[in-house]
């Protein structure tokens, strides 16, 4: 079976765009980061140490199982709730998902810089009647923009 999201021949940013199209309501943002790909990807791939530094709702991440590119994570949020996530991690591509959320990163070199895309999607979000879907989506995009800025700062600091 041809799975376009799994194909290694597809540019990772394009792969993330395909994934976003399959997840209605997913928030996706991109940022051109003024750091080389290796420095940026080192931050993204350091799930245990870096994730709590750029993701405000995450307190701890622990890799509890690793089989090549496939990982099982135990993620604790800032309220103390734990959730198991399955992840696929390889250079330029990180997909993490649980029963409630899908999170993905895609990156590619852009000269001496990096193009980094980030997707977040809640699987079980039922909007309240008084809640504006577009307001929630804008807030999610603003949150992702902040996360991408923090990843850029961490990548630049790591290069020093």
Identify the meaning behind each predicted range:
Residues 3, 49, 66-73, 88-96:
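Short, hydrophobic/aromatic-rich segments at coil-to-beta transitions
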Residues 95-153, 157:
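Beta-strand/loop substructures that line and gate deep hydrophobic ligand-binding cavities in soluble
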């Amino acid at each position: 079976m041809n799975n376009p999201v799994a194909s290694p021949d597809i540019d990772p940013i394009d792969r993330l765009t395909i994934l976003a199209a399959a997840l209605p309501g997913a928030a996706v943002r991109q940022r051109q980061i003024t750091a080389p790909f290796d420095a940026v990807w080192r931050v993204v791939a350091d799930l245990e140490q870096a994730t709590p530094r750029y993701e405000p709702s995450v307190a701890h991440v622990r890799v509890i199982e690793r089989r090549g590119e496939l990982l099982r994570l135990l993620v604790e949020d800032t309220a103390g709730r734990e959730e198991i996530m399955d992840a696929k991690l390889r250079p330029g591509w990180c997909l993490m998902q649980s029963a409630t959320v899908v999170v993905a990163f895609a990156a590619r070199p852009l000269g001496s810089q990096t193009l980094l895309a980030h997707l977040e999607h809640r699987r079980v979000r039922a909007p309240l009647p008084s809640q504006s879907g577009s307001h929630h989506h804008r807030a999610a995009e603003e949150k992702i923009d902040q996360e991408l800025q923090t990843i850029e700062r961490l990548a630049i600091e790591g290069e020093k």
